[in-house]
């Protein structure tokens, strides 16, 4: 591993409609095969559904959903003398956001609604109300960390 300087963080350009960096990041995590325009269409469509159906401001619902899905703890495998332990560690702030976005996208795709816009809107509203599969994933991650608290002294 080279012992050079730390790699500088890339500047994230805010999305054109909401002028928000988190929305731009979420668009990128929603994107498949480089189709950014499609991803933006899905996200903005989902925001419109949230505004129309649920009569709430979509950017507020989005932020609340992200906050509710962000994990505080996770487990990492650590090998000690032939045995592998699941060691609970605190999640770095950037990784919290990245995991929350990834889980929201993953569990939106797995829902039963017809279009991706509807699925994403439903998952965002559920997550904002502390329901849904993405929130369940966060709770499972926390439970796993809690169950393996005994191995916390193996942290590095």
UniProtKB/Swiss-Prot annotation:
Q: Which UniProt keywords apply?
A: Ribonucleoprotein, Ribosomal protein, RNA-binding, rRNA-binding, tRNA-binding
Coiled-coil-forming residues are none
Record's PROSITE patterns?
Answer: RIBOSOMAL_S7
Q: Which domain of life is it from?
A: Bacteria
Query: What biological processes does GO assign it?
Result: translation
Q: Does the keyword Mitochondrion apply?
A: no
What does UniProt give as GO cellular component? small ribosomal subunit
Q: Name one GO molecular function term.
A: tRNA binding
Pfam families (alphabetical) = Ribosomal_S7
**InterPro entries reported for this sequence:** Ribosomal_uS7 (IPR000235), Ribosomal_uS7_bac/org-type (IPR005717), Ribosomal_uS7_CS (IPR020606), Ribosomal_uS7_dom (IPR023798), Ribosomal_uS7_dom_sf (IPR036823)
Question: What family is it from?
Answer: Belongs to the universal ribosomal protein uS7 family.
> Its biological function?
One of the primary rRNA binding proteins, it binds directly to 16S rRNA where it nucleates assembly of the head domain of the 30S subunit. Is located at the subunit interface close to the decoding center, probably blocks exit of the E-site tRNA.
Q: How does it assemble?
A: Part of the 30S ribosomal subunit. Contacts proteins S9 and S11.
* NCBIfam families reported for this sequence: rpsG_bact
User: What is the protein name stated in its UniProt record?
Assistant: Small ribosomal subunit protein uS7
Originating organism: Sorangium cellulosum (strain So ce56) (Polyangium cellulosum (strain So ce56))
Ranked from the top, the taxonomy reads: Bacteria, Pseudomonadati, Myxococcota, Polyangia, Polyangiales
């Amino acid at each position: 591993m080279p012992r050079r300087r730390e790699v500088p963080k890339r500047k994230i350009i805010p999305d054109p409609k909401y002028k928000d960096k988190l929305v731009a990041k979420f668009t990128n995590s929603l994107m498949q095969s480089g189709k950014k325009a499609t991803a933006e269409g899905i996200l903005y469509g989902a925001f419109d559904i949230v505004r129309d159906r649920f009569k709430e401001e979509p950017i507020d619902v989005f932020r609340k959903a992200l906050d509710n899905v962000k994990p505080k703890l996770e487990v990492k495998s650590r090998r000690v003398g032939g045995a592998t332990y699941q060691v609970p560690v605190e999640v770095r702030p950037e990784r919290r956001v990245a995991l929350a976005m990834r889980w929201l996208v993953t569990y939106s795709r797995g829902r039963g609604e017809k279009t991706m816009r509807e699925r994403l809107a439903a998952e965002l509203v559920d997550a904002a109300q502390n329901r849904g599969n993405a929130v369940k994933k966060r709770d499972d991650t926390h439970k796993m960390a809690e169950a393996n608290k005994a191995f916390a002294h193996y942290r590095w």
